[in-house]
C-alpha cells in the first residue's frame, strides 16, 4: 500500500437522493484513501440521460461536503484526468471502442431483444447459464455492411476468449476464479450509441489512476468482465474488494420500503454528520474503538481486511446510539443553533437551557419540547406524570405550593422546604415534583431545569398539581 499513492473513488449515478447504502460505499473508499495519505475521487456516472438528475447531483455533492467527505479530484475541484462527468467523456470512450474493434476484441451485434430472449429461454431449458450465443460473432465484413445499409443499428459486444479463466484477489473475499465460457460476449456499447456501465466504469478507473475499488458484492460478477476489458486495452486494473450489502429487517437490500432514509432526510431530523459516519463505519466493518471518532480516527482504524462478506442489517437503534454520542460530545456553541430554541427561550437563557437538557436529547425536536416545558405555560401531563401527582396526594402539593409561594422556588430551597414540611424524601419527593413541574417522570437533571423556570411558573405548576390531586382524591373517596 505504501509503494504508490492510494487513490479510491466514489462513482454514483445520481438519479435521486443519497441513501445510506451508497453513503457507506463512499465512506469506506474515502477512509481507505485518507488513511494512507491518498486521494479520494468523485466521478459522476451520468451516461443514462433519461434518468440523470442535475438536482440530485448537486444534492449528493452537498451531502458529501456536509458529512466532511471531501474529494481531492472531481467536479468543482478539478484534477489530472478531467472531465469528471462521464457524459462528457464520450470522445475518450470512442477511441477505445475503435481500438477494440481494430484488434478483434469487439464486434457489432444486430440481434434484437426478442432474439436474445428466445436464446436465453432455450439455454435455461437445457440447464445452461444464459449467455450470448455468439450469433453475430462470426459475421463477415460484407454481412455487417449489408445490415448497416438496411438501417440496422448494432450494439458493440466484447469478444470473450473461450476456454480461459479470469483470476483476481478480492481484498475482502480472497481469490476469485471465473471461467470465461460461463461469461459470454457482453455489450460494451448499446445500439443507440450510449456507453455501457461495464465499459465506462472500468476505463475511467484506469484513466483516473484508481488503485483500489471497494463496492457492493452485487458487482462481484462484473469484475471478470471489466478485467477482460482492461487487459485487452492494455490498461492497469485497480484492486477490487466486494463487501456484503446492507439489508433491511426483511433481509432484502436496504431500500425505502424496508427502512432506508436519505442523508437529507436524516439531516433534517437533526442527525449529526459524525453520528452517521460513526454508525456506517461499523456496519459490516469491525472498528476496534468503541469511542466516537472524527474522520481521521475512523480512517486510522479502517482496514478492508475487517470488512464482512456477509450482509449487514440496518439497525436504527445503533444509529440513534451514535447520534446520542455525537450530541453529548458537541459544544454549546454548536448545539444552540442545531436545537433551534432561541425563539422559545427568553433572551439570555438559551445557553443555560442547552446545558440543562443536552444530556437527555438526541434531536432538535426533543430540545424544543423541553424549551416549551420550561418556559411556556404549564406543560401537558403524560399519563405517568398524572399518576405520580395523584399518588403523592393533595397534602404533599399544598405543602410544596405553599413553600414556593413563600419564595422557595429554586430547586435546592424548594426540595428542602418540602422535605421538612412533609417528611417525604428520596424518590417519593423528587418524582412528584418532576411530574408536576415538567409534565413527565423522566428527563434532564431537575435542578437546572427548575432553576430556569422562574418563581411564577413553579408556583403555577405546583398549584395545578395540588388541584388535580385534590380532585382525583375526592373522586376516589
From Swiss-Prot:
<protein>
    <recommendedName>
        <fullName>Glutamate--tRNA ligase 1</fullName>
        <ecNumber>6.1.1.17</ecNumber>
    </recommendedName>
</protein>
<dbReference type="InterPro" id="IPR049940">
    <property type="entry name" value="GluQ/Sye"/>
</dbReference>
<keyword id="KW-0547">Nucleotide-binding</keyword>
<feature type="short sequence motif" description="'HIGH' region">
    <location>
        <begin position="12"/>
        <end position="22"/>
    </location>
</feature>
<dbReference type="InterPro" id="IPR004527">
    <property type="entry name" value="Glu-tRNA-ligase_bac/mito"/>
</dbReference>
<dbReference type="GO" id="GO:0008270">
    <property type="term" value="F:zinc ion binding"/>
</dbReference>
<comment type="subunit">
    <text>Monomer.</text>
</comment>
<dbReference type="InterPro" id="IPR020058">
    <property type="entry name" value="Glu/Gln-tRNA-synth_Ib_cat-dom"/>
</dbReference>
<dbReference type="GO" id="GO:0006424">
    <property type="term" value="P:glutamyl-tRNA aminoacylation"/>
</dbReference>
<dbReference type="InterPro" id="IPR014729">
    <property type="entry name" value="Rossmann-like_a/b/a_fold"/>
</dbReference>
<dbReference type="Pfam" id="PF00749">
    <property type="entry name" value="tRNA-synt_1c"/>
</dbReference>
<keyword id="KW-0648">Protein biosynthesis</keyword>
<comment type="function">
    <text>Catalyzes the attachment of glutamate to tRNA(Glu) in a two-step reaction: glutamate is first activated by ATP to form Glu-AMP and then transferred to the acceptor end of tRNA(Glu).</text>
</comment>
<dbReference type="GO" id="GO:0004818">
    <property type="term" value="F:glutamate-tRNA ligase activity"/>
</dbReference>
<keyword id="KW-0963">Cytoplasm</keyword>
<feature type="short sequence motif" description="'KMSKS' region">
    <location>
        <begin position="253"/>
        <end position="257"/>
    </location>
</feature>
<dbReference type="InterPro" id="IPR008925">
    <property type="entry name" value="aa_tRNA-synth_I_cd-bd_sf"/>
</dbReference>
<dbReference type="Pfam" id="PF19269">
    <property type="entry name" value="Anticodon_2"/>
</dbReference>
<dbReference type="GO" id="GO:0005524">
    <property type="term" value="F:ATP binding"/>
</dbReference>
<dbReference type="InterPro" id="IPR033910">
    <property type="entry name" value="GluRS_core"/>
</dbReference>
<keyword id="KW-0436">Ligase</keyword>
<keyword id="KW-0030">Aminoacyl-tRNA synthetase</keyword>
<keyword id="KW-0067">ATP-binding</keyword>
<dbReference type="GO" id="GO:0000049">
    <property type="term" value="F:tRNA binding"/>
</dbReference>
<dbReference type="InterPro" id="IPR001412">
    <property type="entry name" value="aa-tRNA-synth_I_CS"/>
</dbReference>
<comment type="similarity">
    <text>Belongs to the class-I aminoacyl-tRNA synthetase family. Glutamate--tRNA ligase type 1 subfamily.</text>
</comment>
<dbReference type="InterPro" id="IPR045462">
    <property type="entry name" value="aa-tRNA-synth_I_cd-bd"/>
</dbReference>
<dbReference type="InterPro" id="IPR020751">
    <property type="entry name" value="aa-tRNA-synth_I_codon-bd_sub2"/>
</dbReference>
<dbReference type="InterPro" id="IPR000924">
    <property type="entry name" value="Glu/Gln-tRNA-synth"/>
</dbReference>
<feature type="binding site">
    <location>
        <position position="256"/>
    </location>
    <ligand>
        <name>ATP</name>
    </ligand>
</feature>
<dbReference type="GO" id="GO:0005829">
    <property type="term" value="C:cytosol"/>
</dbReference>
